[in-house]
């Protein structure tokens, strides 16, 4: 029967459709982790007339000291970022021309990467809070560069420190603490500022504080798409055409201020009515639509600025009628339409009224012209009629014809004069109304002058009592005093603003000076380190040249010669490792290979000199491979980009994440990704348990005696003796290992404890906390591995060995035939690979890359890497021609494999296809066979015990004296 772990990889196969963590889970995570520095700010962007403030969601990333900004909290990809580590900050003081009591400016500048970014906070307090927090983050990040002891395998960014036992090595302090005087000065110059509701994760659930603007903001691309869609709806059969698409490309952060489609259509209709209908559209006037977009020559010629301008005119508030309507509607108590809708309706009615007036005047002019034409045609008809012109002389007819033309001309002139008279009368009426207004203003001015004359008379009468202090505040003499008071208040406000600005700038200068000194000290240390490395290289090169020179000289075999002394000196120098006796020289002292690697494993054993030399060579080869890989586009950059895309969302299964994990998780991110993998697989268990479930098990293990506790104590020091975290009984790792194993023995009494579980927990504790390591063990035993994998019979482990034998015969037939030919049982070696997931079988770098993929994809990864190890050394194994040498080589060949990239390429590339269904079917097939064999063995054992118990001669021992007697 397949185990619980068979469907693990299927849960991640559909990564693109995976759903991120639920809201409750996200809330729980947010409750455990410290609050992030995030919130809404307005960023000045754009060019030309479109330049303005746009509301953006800002999130600070402590790993790289970047301030990312998004369009909204729901966006996955950031629009850009600001490098805070190399930035300096400033802000403008209060404007001198501002009135007293006016709000101070709330925008500040971030100078970074040769550019100035202007950000604006909703109020002054939030601006101060953002500036202080960004200063603090910059200070902590730059100081952490000095406080960290960097290994070449760690990232240069000090964020996301590991949380397990390796975290103790990561945070070793090798330099002095920051300058106490600088810290004290920073504290004194700090300004009290509390975060508001627009800062923190809770701000993501609130609407973005926008800039008041009558025009709705839409992006250029969205506006173009809406226009295209609205046009295609009027053109049947061409709505889905892909050949008529207009796309705007830009590398700037541009946004177009444009109206919604509905308002745009309303603004377009009056504009189209003003234009005469072309001849080609007369036949379409009676159809359902008054015009067609595809054939209207005026539609495409209308510039974009006319559309936006018409919309701005419609929304302008200069019309007094609009203001009056808005005021009346706002003051009425009954249910009315919203003010914008009523304004739009009144505006459209006014435009329609103006259009009707223009149409009426044009119709009148047309009627007048038609009347003149009718008269002229009647006169022409009258004179051309032969019956009327009979008997009349030609001269008389010519004279009459001229008189008629004069009459027509005079009639037209009379009509024109009539029109001019009407216009002049209208102008006279307008001038009369203006004269009336001017008379009213003149009356008001006369009244004002009269009032001033009265004041002057009163002042003249009270000339003797000018110095009297009984003047009230309403007296004209109090006006200069009030102006002085206003000026004094304005100066006080400016003084207060300059004080706060001066305090901030002093703090900024102090911090930048301290950070510059730290950077200079780091540069000096690095220069000293590189000089020491260069000197050491010259020494080694000199010794090699001496050695080569001596090798040319023939030396008697009995004599020692200087060459042997040089070789001995070179070997002695090569076997030296880094010591922790003088940590203050750690920056200057060159160390290529440390005594322990970043995981805590010993790099050079304490055995004979030959073994130490081989281990040193292997460690140097590992470091060379790592440095060579880092010279290319490293996976660390891809991981940073991935985490940048998850600033506003939870991690989820995806092909991108699977490929990143297969290539290996960087050391600084491994704790985070491992914890996420464990939480994803154990979510169903945790949801049904109490929050303090692990602590309850741990308390039970301490209070009650467990049958497995004795075996656990025996195996603690034998777990990873070559790792410094588990080397002594007082090590922190030993205490945590004991707690996790005891807690699991109480959770799963069917297994209790099995040898091999201790190594699984020990590896997990290197990157996970105690409780997370417990759930990691639950994931491996109860989710990944089949049932009875770690029980007394090891049924699942035996089944997997037979499945692996079948896969080896299929994927590597030559090697399988070679093993069968010399009767080599390689499962004696591979059994431990599967039981403890390659712990103590491969070098540490490869081990943790295997565990990365194992915790994400499940147990199928073990089959992949086991086959890849054999394929990696297939040619070397085929050269061995006897069973003893083959078996001896199999016992240590995995420790000689150092190239993790090549091994991963074989595992996930050369061995494909590798379907999970095949492993399931093979497991089910071999499970029945192994069960039958175990049943037969159990029956044989019971028969043997029964015969032994029923035998009369129980084989009692007899002494020599009894035999003699």
From Swiss-Prot:
Regions annotated as coiled coil: 339-537
Domain Rab-GAP TBC: from-to ranges: 664-858
PH domain: residues covered: 34-139
GO molecular function: GTPase activator activity
InterPro entries named among the record's database cross-references: PH-like_dom_sf, PH_domain, Rab-GAP-TBC_dom, Rab-GAP_TBC_sf, Rab_GAP_TBC_domain
Keywords: Coiled coil, Endosome, GTPase activation, Phosphoprotein
UniProt KW Coiled coil keyword: yes
Pfam families named among the record's database cross-references: PH, RabGAP-TBC
A Gene Ontology BP annotation from the UniProt entry: endocytosis
Role of this protein: GTPase-activating protein that plays a role in the early steps of endocytosis.
Name this polypeptide is given: TBC1 domain family member 2B
Organism of provenance: Mus musculus (Mouse)
Gene name of the encoded protein: Tbc1d2b
